[in-house]
From Swiss-Prot:
Subunit-structure text: Associated with the spliceosome.
Lineage: Eukaryota, Fungi, Dikarya, Basidiomycota, Agaricomycotina
Gene that this sequence comes from: RSE1
Keyword Nucleus belongs to the record: yes
GO-annotated molecular function: U2 snRNA binding
Record GO biological process: mRNA splicing, via spliceosome
Protein name, per record: Pre-mRNA-splicing factor RSE1
Coiled-coil stretches: none
Major localisation: nucleus
Functional description taken from the UniProt entry: Involved in pre-mRNA splicing and cell cycle control.
Xref: Pfam families: Beta-prop_RSE1_1st, Beta-prop_RSE1_2nd, CPSF_A
Entry GO terms, CC: nucleus; spliceosomal complex; U2 snRNP
Length: 1217
């Protein structure tokens, strides 16, 4: 088996984000690391207030940290990146000719991989961009001086060591000293004594130190300048501005760092008295007597400079933002102050833009962009100052707690949301829309805690509808018109009906007008705004050129002939007559249409004609394309010296029904200018796209795609200011450019018969379309998104969900640890009120999706079972479980004693602890399914001795993985009845898959086991095969009777297959006697599976589904990851494809595609060498190579560059999207 790995949707979680002017302009961009492997740059769109993606590039390596820097005299920021390649990479973002990243230098500093003593975990940059420090978790610290050579190129110097043995590093940051020698601060813990002390006493006395390292630029040497003990719970350092202003003697700030510890924030600098303040916290209304107070830490921070001042925004682990500022007199700190600012989702990074926005890169779920409404000055919110405490807060022991009441957003305004799927905890791929959709939908359980969502992912672009209005009939075409060439907005909407034409005026309202000069008694074939102030109408019997209100020039069709097709632009008109002739018109300098004297005879009757828009600076477009009923398309010249000469001819496989010439930018074909594409819609529903040579009109690089059962209609459109093509078949498709690559995607919208661009005051960048007898005005808010997302809010973290066997209903289990359930909250509130204690219920009533929930001690759980309607995106019902009972598994089972009806079984644990793993008791809850799956009725529950981590229905019984045991249960009147079990599994049973009488069991740490059930002479569950390698299994799916695809906790997908002869031998043993007496092999089962495929995805795989993704396509393995990515493993169908893609992959590995210098084979084979899988993402980056390199690779493959690109597109579109 050979597979091709394709990414369908990139990872969405942001591990790190920095802000800078990476493009060199005055505007700022946000650089994000998505999924640890992808570099992405956002830019704020000043018009819409939204974030637009400028470039997104796969690094083919795990990026550990990034930072921006700028050397003196430079006009743009550069990027430093550390990764698992063991190299320090200097990257540049280049905006032209197409936005992309360039790797300027890669300095090797250690072994590959993410190791604790290899630098890369921490990256700190001198604020003046002169040097950087790269640190590891333990011991190693390297300092590089950043220089420019004689050619002006950046490069790092040889590394200067600042190692310290037996030292653990918590955080490193650059200290702002102005133009003094670069200084770095580190939080370090010396464990040398603890390592030698077996009593643990040395560990209890271990201190954490704040250490300053100075780079002496004169001596080119690093010294350990200052070190002082600090709070051992310190976890984060924040840079404080310092140094003198370049234009005055004023100090920018006091320098030093903010040390963020548990419950406190401390300002520290060398040999200066520190200032300490408490971190304000929320009151917990549910805290009980005897509960230990939970500490509060800062998890992210950002510093922002404004004119003559600066402030910090620090975020706690609850999501609360605090404004911190320092009152100082030169270099002397007067006071350190803090106040509550607002509450936003917990973030990995915070980025403040100069335009007054803050980007919150959330740890989980959607990332948000907020606009500052105020800086919380004089808002009445309580402030806490270091001067409020003795010795500026530097007293032994903790400071008194400071409390605040969280409030809805007051200083920030949410303006944009970047959808994010991470983490995907479970997913199913299934087509619940039936015949109305030719592709399945991806249903995913996403998020954590109160921000969790259930999401429906559909392939296509989202559409925002603005107007939907019924019409008196069913129109065939729709157009919009400007009155003059210089008009900003369209003035008319023209609708063509089979027996007439309707003209609507666009103003404050849309209303019918009659005095336009258009012929309204018959259908219209085309309309156009001609020249400066002319309008054109083409109808079956002639042309009407409306030059003024009282002047209409008409051109009648020859007697006995009609116009069957027409195409126009603002200076040219071509019509096709029913006598297989073409007539060409061109606008003369006086503004009149001049007919070319000769008619062009065609080889067959014309079915469609098209010309492109007039290029800027020219008087005409050069080519005309004509489709004829003899299954040919001709390219005809419109140049003065060769007018109506046929330049090229292409035979087709079916008659063309629509044709469209459009100039669209596609960097895979031409990296410098737009490409002229000829798009042809055929009678059989296929879209052909071919490239027209701009010199001789020859056709090349033809590609095809099946769009639907209906013959496509094609039309040019402007979408978000760029030329595009719309295709109307059984679905509506859009061909457009995104990140300089041509994309073809369907619209998630009602089927349209026709559409046109619309520019109006209410909709400057819209589209107008017709669907039946309804007029629709809509726009496409965001291009580039392959999957449209519809979400339903959940209460707790989703764990697993399953679908009803026959109805479109999902059953989901949710559970959160350290969270009070609803019954627990009611109990505690009643108990406190009975004791006469005040309970602030206002805090409990705050929206949990914005403020979270009060934290409970370990062992407390909140959980529920939810019934979902995925088509309506709504919750049908919710069943809350008992206090501290959490659901971990769910299945639908048919029981022999159940009357043939399905039952829902939920596995739960009570008082579950995670470390060590265990529970007070477990239960199997059984629910009857009523009213077509929409109602659940509790029947009974069965006690177990461990947590049921997985369940599955099996031949009228229930299989349950409970701890190390696999058990078989039968339905009873008051409980489930255990019939047999196998407790020979090593650690814990986490997955169960059933095929006939065969059971594939996934163990938590020891991979998969093949089992069979035998009822003669007694009921038995027998293991007959297992894996030879230990694997930490996360998900398993059956590929065929002998083969399984599995994912593990280290980001690997692997395919295991059982020898068919062994499989047949086991099936022929009705009693299992042979299995029982076979000799164990390698301390396991008698037989071993063979690994036939292995590939490292780079993120934990949470689900795998076998299903075809496109109409008529073959089955693929669709997987999801915890970082929010969706991908597919596509099987090859021929040995030629395997050889071609494998050879192309081999060539691409030699092209230094990785921005961080990671070896591709080592990356994709991180734990086990790659086997049987080709990296499709790497192969598709062939289109990004310079043309000479593309030619060299294509020559080795005995193909042209166009053939290689065509094959890559075909491999994706034939099985995925």
């Amino acid at each position: 088996m050979h597979l091709l790995n394709l990414t369908l949707s990139s990872p969405t979680n942001v591990s790190t984000a920095v802000v800078g002017s990476f493009s060199g302009s005055k505007s700022q961009e946000i650089l994000c690391v998505r999924g640890g492997t992808k570099l992405e740059i956002f830019k704020l769109n000043a018009t819409t207030g939204q974030l637009d993606t400028i470039v997104s590039t796969e690094a083919f390596g795990t990026i550990r940290n990034i930072a921006g820097f700028r050397l003196a005299g430079m006009t743009k920021d550069y990027i430093l990146a550390t990764s698992d390649s063991g190299r320090l990479s200097i990257l540049e973002f280049v905006i032209s000719p197409t936005p992309h990243f360039e790797s300027l230098y890669q300095e090797v500093f250690g072994k590959s991989g993410s190791r604790r003593i290899v630098p890369g975990q921490f990256l700190a940059v001198d604020p003046k961009g002169r040097s950087c420090l790269v640190g590891s978790l333990e011991k190693t610290k390297l300092v590089y001086v950043l220089n420019r050579n004689t050619e002006g190129k950046l490069y790092p110097s040889s590394p200067l060591e600042a190692h310290k043995n037996h030292t653990l590093v918590t955080h490193i940051v650059g200290v702002d000293q102005g133009y003094d020698n670069p200084l770095y601060a580190a939080l370090e813990t010396d464990y040398s004594e603890s390592d030698q002390d077996s009593t643990g006493e040395a560990y209890e006395n271990t201190q954490k130190h704040l250490t300053f390292y100075e780079l002496d630029l004169g001596l080119n040497h690093v010294v350990r300048k200052w070190s002082e003990p600090t709070d051992r719970r310190a976890n984060l350092l924040v840079q404080v501005p310092g140094g003198q202003n370049a234009n005055s003697d004023r100090f920018e700030g006091p320098s030093g760092v903010l040390v963020c510890t548990e419950d406190h924030i401390i300002w520290k600098h060398m040999d200066v008295e520190a200032h300490r303040i408490p971190i304000p916290r929320r009151r917990n209304p549910l805290v009980q007597r005897g509960d230990k107070s939970r500490g509060l830490i800062i998890v992210s921070a950002v510093m922002h400079k404004i004119k003559g001042a600066f402030f910090f925004l620090l975020q706690s682990e609850d999501g609360d933002l605090y404004k911190v500022w320092i009152e100082h007199n030169g270099e002397d700190v007067v006071a350190l102050k803090i106040k509550y600012f607002d509450t936003v989702p917990v973030a990995n990074s915070l980025c403040i833009l100069k335009r007054g926005y803050i980007y919150v890169a959330s740890e989980f779920s959607d990332q948000n962009l907020y606009q500052f409404q105020s800086l919380a000055e004089d808002d009445g919110e309580q402030e806490w100052s270091s001067t409020d405490y003795p010795e500026n807060g530097n007293i032994d022991g903790p400071l008194p707690f400071a409390f605040f009441d969280p409030q809805p957003l007051r200083n920030l305004l949410l303006v944009d949301t970047v959808p994010s799927l991470d983490p995907i905890t479970d997913a199913h791929v299934v087509n619940l829309l039936g015949a109305s959709s030719d592709t399945p939908q991806i249903y995913a359980a996403c998020g954590r805690g109160a921000r969790s969502t259930f999401r429906t992912l559909k392939h296509g672009l989202d559409v925002a509808e603005m107007v939907s209005s019924p019409l008196p009939g069913v129109p065939t075409n729709v157009w919009t018109l400007k009155l003059t060439e210089d008009d900003e907005y369209d003035s008319y909407i023209v609708l063509s009906f089979p027996n007439g034409t309707l003209v609507l005026s666009i103003g404050e309202t849309i209303e019918e007008v009659n005095d336009t000069g258009f012929l309204s008694s018959g259908p219209t074939l085309a309309v156009q705004q001609l020249g400066n102030a002319g309008l054109l109408q083409v109808h079956p019997y002639g042309l009407r050129h409306i030059r003024a209100a009282d002047r209409v020039d008409e051109w009648p069709a020859p007697p006995g002939q009609t116009i069957v097709a027409a195409t126009t632009n603002r200076r040219q008109v071509v019509i096709a007559l029913s006598t297989a002739e073409l007539v060409y018109f061109e606008l003369d300098p006086e503004g009149s249409l001049s007919e070319y004297q000769e008619k062009k005879a065609l080889p067959g009757n014309a079915t469609c004609v098209t010309i492109a828009e007039v290029p800027e600076g020219r008087r005409r477009t050069s080519f005309l394309a004509v489709g004829c009923d003899n299954q040919t398309v001709s390219i005809i010249s419109l140049e003065p010296d060769s007018t109506l000469d046929t330049l090229s001819l292409q035979a087709l496989t079916a008659p063309p029904t629509s044709i469209c010439l459009a100039e669209i930018f596609d960097t895979s074909i031409d990296k410098n200018r737009a490409t002229m594409f000829l798009n042809i819609g055929l009678m059989n529903g296929v879209l052909l796209r071919t490239v027209v040579d701009p010199v001789d009109g020859s056709l090349s690089d033809t590609r095809l795609r099946f769009l639907g059962a209906k013959p496509p209609k094609l039309v040019r459109a402007n979408v978000q200011g760029q030329p595009s093509v719309m295709a109307f078949s059984s679905r509506t498709w859009l061909l457009y450019t995104y990140q300089d690559m041509l994309q073809t995607q369907p619209l998630i919208y009602d089927t349209l018969e026709y559409a046109w661009s619309l520019s109006a005051a209410m909709c400057p960048d819209g589209l107008i379309g017709i669907s039946g007898n309804t007029l629709r005005i809509f726009n496409i808010p965001k291009l580039g998104e392959k999957l449209k997302q519809d979400s339903t809010a959940l209460t707790y973290t989703p764990r697993k969900f399953i679908s009803h066997p026959f109805n479109s209903v999902f059953y989901m289990i949710e559970a959160d640890h350290r969270t009070y359930s609803k019954s627990a909250i009611e109990r505690i509130v009643k108990q406190k009120e009975s004791e006469g204690r005040r309970v602030d219920t206002l805090l409990l009533d705050l929206p949990a999706n914005e403020f979270g929930r009060p934290r409970a001690p370990a062992g407390h759980w909140a959980s529920c079972v939810r019934v979902l309607d995925p088509l309506a995106n709504e919750t049908i019902m919710t069943l809350d479980l008992d206090e501290d009972e959490a659901a971990f598994s769910i299945a639908i089972a048919y029981f022999e004693r159940g009357g043939g009806e399905p039952f829902l079984v939920v596995g739960t644990g009570v008082k579950t602890t995670l470390q060590p793993k265990g529970c007070k008791e477990g239960y199997l809850r059984v629910y009857a399914i009523k009213e077509q799956g929409r109602i659940l009725e509790f029947l009974h529950k069965t006690k177990t001795d461990d947590i049921p981590l997985c369940l599955a229905g099996f031949q009228g019984f229930l299989l349950a993985g409970i701890g190390k045991s696999l058990r078989l249960y039968e339905m009873g009147k008051k409980a489930l009845l255990r019939k047999c079990e196998n407790n020979g599994f090593p650690t814990a049973v986490v997955t169960i898959n059933v095929q006939g009488a065969r059971i594939i069991v996934g163990d938590m740490q020891e991979s998969t086991f093949y089992c069979v059930y035998r009822s003669i002479p007694t009921r038995q569950l027998l293991i007959f095969a297992d894996d030879s390698q230990p694997r930490w299994i996360t998900c398993v799916t059956s590929v065929d009777y002998e083969t399984v695809a599995c994912g593990d906790k280290f980001g690997n997908i692997f395919i295991n297959r059982l020898d068919p002869s062994i499989s047949e031998k086991v099936d022929d043993d009705p009693t299992g006697a042979t299995i029982l007496h076979e000799k164990s092999f390698l301390m396991g089962a008698a037989h071993k599976t063979e690994m036939i495929g292995h590939y490292n995805i780079g993120s934990v795989v949470t689900s795998i589904t076998k299903i075809p993704l496109v109409a008529g396509g073959r089955d693929v393995l669709v997987y999801t990851t915890i970082s929010g990515a969706v991908g597919a493993l596509v099987p090859f169908v021929s040995s030629d494809d395997i050889e071609f893609m494998s050879t192309l992959e081999m060539h691409m590995r030699t092209q230094d595609i990785s921005l961080v210098g990671r070896d591709h084979i080592a990356y994709r084979g991180y734990y086990v060498p790659i086997k049987g899988v080709v990296d499709g993402d790497l192969c598709e980056s062939f289109s990004l190579l310079p043309y000479p390199k593309q030619q060299a690779i294509a020559l080795d493959l005995d193909r042209s560059v166009g053939d290689v690109l065509k094959k890559l597109e075909q491999m994706r579109t034939s099985s995925a999207f």
